[in-house]
């Protein structure tokens, strides 16, 4: 009995045309040209299911997916009208005939067997029925006899109709992507060195290439090659656009451009060369380089890398080298970007290094780097540890801080710069942060910390864990008062510098404190209390009234004589430890 029920259930199931799985009748949709299940319709989208069905129909015909005695679902009524399965070569000939480009000189639209959504092809021609195949075969064979060539897939001849394994799967789709050579219009695809011979018929362009290809003259090809990135040959698709010889020639030209000597720059006397003149020369030489291979370097980069390089370049060096870097010619020659103020010997070598390392995309009229709040933000990349050290624009520093110093001695230094050779993105974020502040030059060596809180607000339990700097954020206070800059007021620091030099201890019981679990007085940085002492102090002062600092003093708020007091929520949080323990024991 159970076997009979199973047979009846299996007989009621309908096979989906796309996923070829047996489905129950309530899971099938009959609104399209073939019966498809609801899962396929939801996955593909109701507006694209017809295109997918047409693609699947062509694939099944081309590859002979149906064994003997089995026909595609729903094809019993039209089985007599459909011819036997066709090969991919026949489909190519039929498409040539239908598009009206049956001549041997025209480049046909290649049947991309692995493309999933033939949007352009399906939108330009009506769906082909079985009778179309039968009527078009003799004409196609007369117009162009079949050749034993394998079918072109994405413009590359492969023996079995499948694309190469090393190509990413997005090359098999018709959606535009940067690897399809979209920078060159389809009607202006040349053999990149100006060859006037058209592409052979077998090399059909895989994407949405037009049927007619115009050969471009040598000047047009050269202008296209210099203005657009030649990433067509770099992504293993040389057969569809250019020959291997053309690619080699392009590489030789690019190498020649990089090796040619720089244009001679006008130099005045060494004693009259000022900082602005040196900056103008550096900017002009960088702009001249960017018109060569620099543009291609910038264009070939991803968008985020281009934005980062642009932002970092705009904050370039505009001041003279300091004494430390003058004493170390190894740093000056190859690793640092900039120039010397006397301009006698080191300027050309360093400017050439800067031109190779940092192509400038800004317009030529711009002289020197833009300034933030009247001060330039130079970044000196030291390529040893990836640490970015800003040259301090004030003349009071004899030398910039060494790489071993904390990166927080200057506000213009990224706070994450000393960690693992931080990427330029963090530096870029901090540059944007400094650009938004109106007092970046005043507190140039104030500790830049996201944990700084408003001193007028009473402490809260949510911010209790944020009232002390991390170990890496405190070391900069030692270098804070150097060079005659404005010293940091101690009250603006959320913690004392004892956090790294000595272990944290409770002010009352002198027991060691946990890293993130203690009570910090917002007025006196040295007042730190463990939770048991804080609870005892709150109970002694009376939790119902005003509860002041657990040290017994009425520590005033910064900038006023009013002593701070705990909020009721903070008192409840501190006292909640005992209650929670009792509840856990009771349960």
Curated annotation (Swiss-Prot):
Q: Can the keyword Zinc be found in this entry's annotation?
A: yes
What does it do? Acts as a transcriptional corepressor in a IRF2-dependent manner; this repression is not mediated by histone deacetylase activities. Represses the NFAT1-dependent transactivation of NFAT-responsive promoters. Acts as a coactivator of VEGFA expression in cardiac and skeletal muscles. Plays a role in immature B-cell differentiation.
Residue intervals of every RING-type zinc finger in the record: 506-553
Q: Could you cite one Gene Ontology molecular function of this protein?
A: zinc ion binding
Among the record's GO biological process terms, what is one?
immature B cell differentiation
**Record family assignment:** Belongs to the IRF2BP family.
Q: Where are the annotated segments for Cys-rich?
A: 506-550
Q: Which residues carry this modification: Phosphoserine?
A: 71, 175, 240, 318, 360, 406, 423, 455, 457, 460
Q: How is it modified after translation?
A: Phosphorylation at Ser-360 is required for nuclear targeting.
Q: Please give the residue positions where the record annotates the modification N-acetylalanine.
A: 2
- Identify the keywords attached in UniProt to this record, alphabetized: Acetylation, Activator, Cytoplasm, Disease variant, Isopeptide bond, Metal-binding, Nucleus, Phosphoprotein, Repressor, Transcription, Transcription regulation, Ubl conjugation, Zinc, Zinc-finger
Compartments annotated for it: namely: Cytoplasm; Nucleus
Q: Report the protein name in the record.
A: Interferon regulatory factor 2-binding protein 2
InterPro entries given in the database record: I2BP1/2_C3HC4-RING_sf (IPR044882), Interferon_reg_fac2-bd1_2_Znf (IPR022750)
Q: What is known of its domains?
A: The C-terminal RING-type zinc finger domain is sufficient for interaction with IRF2.
Subcellular location, principal: cytoplasm
The entry describes its oligomerization and partners as: Interacts with IRF2. Part of a corepressor complex containing IRF2 and IRF2BP1. Interacts with VGLL4.
Q: Locations of Basic and acidic residues compositional bias?
A: 247-260, 292-306
Stretches for region Disordered: 126-192, 225-306, 342-420, 437-494
Q: Where is this cross-link: Glycyl lysine isopeptide (Lys-Gly) (interchain with G-Cter in SUMO2)?
A: 289, 303, 324, 326, 348
Q: Which organism is it from?
A: Homo sapiens (Human)
Give start-end ranges for motif Nuclear localization signal: 354-361
Known disease link: Immunodeficiency, common variable, 14: A primary immunodeficiency resulting in recurrent sinopulmonary infections since early childhood, and characterized by hypogammaglobulinemia with undetectable IgG and IgA, poor response to vaccination, and decreased levels of switched memory B cells. CVID14 inheritance is autosomal dominant.
The record gives the effect of mutating residue 551 to N as: In CVID14; increased protein abundance in patient-derived B lymphocytes; impairs immature B cell differentiation
């Amino acid at each position: 009995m159970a076997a009979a029920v199973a047979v009846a259930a299996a007989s009621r199931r309908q096979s989906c045309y796309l996923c070829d799985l047996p489905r129950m009748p309530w899971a099938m949709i009959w609104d399209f040209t073939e019966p498809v299940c609801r899962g396929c319709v939801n996955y593909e989208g109701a507006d694209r299911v017809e295109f997918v069905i047409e693609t699947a129909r062509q694939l099944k015909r081309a590859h002979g997916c149906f064994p003997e005695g089995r026909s595609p679902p729903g094809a019993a009524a039209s089985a007599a009208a459909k011819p036997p399965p066709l090969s991919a070569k026949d489909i190519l000939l039929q498409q040539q005939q239908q598009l009206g480009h049956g001549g041997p000189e025209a480049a046909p639209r290649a049947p991309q067997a692995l493309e999933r959504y033939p949007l352009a092809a399906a939108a330009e021609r009506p769906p082909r029925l079985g009778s179309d195949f039968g009527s078009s075969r003799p004409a196609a064979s007369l117009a162009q006899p079949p050749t034993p060539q394998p079918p072109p897939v994405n413009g590359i001849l492969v023996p079995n109709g499948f694309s190469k394994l090393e190509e990413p799967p997005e090359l098999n789709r018709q959606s535009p992507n940067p690897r399809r050579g979209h920078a060159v219009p389809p009607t202006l695809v040349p053999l990149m060195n100006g060859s006037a011979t058209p592409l052979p018929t077998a090399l059909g362009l895989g994407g949405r290439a037009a049927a007619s290809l115009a050969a471009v003259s040598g000047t047009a090809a050269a202008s296209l090659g210099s203005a657009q990135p030649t990433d067509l040959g770099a992504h293993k698709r040389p057969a569809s656009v250019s020959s291997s010889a053309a690619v080699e020639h392009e590489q030789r030209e690019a190498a020649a451009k990089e090796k040619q000597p720089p244009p001679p720059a006008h130099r005045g006397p060494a004693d009259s060369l000022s900082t602005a003149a040196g900056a103008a020369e550096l900017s002009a030489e960088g702009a001249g380089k960017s018109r060569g291979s620099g543009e291609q370097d910038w264009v070939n980069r991803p968008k985020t890398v281009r934005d980062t390089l642009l932002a970092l370049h705009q904050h370039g060096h505009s001041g003279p080298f300091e004494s430390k870097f003058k004493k170390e010619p190894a740093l000056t020659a190859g690793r640092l970007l900039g120039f010397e103020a006397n301009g006698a010997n080191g300027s050309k070598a360093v400017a050439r290094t800067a031109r190779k390392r940092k192509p400038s995309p800004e317009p030529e009229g711009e002289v020197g780097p833009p300034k933030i709040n009247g001060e330039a933000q130079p970044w000196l990349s030291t390529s040893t540890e990836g640490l970015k050290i800003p040259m301090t624009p004030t003349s009071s520093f004899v030398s910039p801080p060494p790489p071993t110093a904390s990166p927080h001695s200057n506000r213009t230094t990224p706070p994450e710069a000393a960690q693992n050779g931080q990427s330029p993105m963090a530096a870029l974020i901090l540059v944007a942060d400094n650009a938004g502040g109106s007092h970046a030059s005043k507190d140039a060596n104030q500790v830049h910390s996201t944990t700084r809180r408003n001193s007028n607000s009473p402490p809260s339990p949510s911010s209790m864990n944020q009232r002390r700097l991390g170990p890496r954020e405190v070391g900069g206070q030692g270098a804070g008062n150097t060079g005659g800059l404005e010293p940091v007021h101690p009250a603006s620091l959320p913690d004392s510098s004892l956090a790294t030099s000595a272990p944290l201890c409770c002010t009352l019981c002198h027991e060691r404190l946990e890293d993130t679990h203690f009570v910090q007085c917002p007025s006196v940085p040295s007042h730190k209390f463990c939770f048991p002492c804080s609870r005892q102090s709150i109970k002694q002062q009376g939790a119902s009234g005003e509860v002041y600092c657990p040290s017994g003093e009425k520590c005033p708020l910064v900038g006023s004589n009013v002593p701070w007091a705990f909020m009721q929520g903070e008192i409840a949080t501190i006292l909640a430890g005992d209650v929670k323990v009792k509840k856990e024991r009771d349960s």
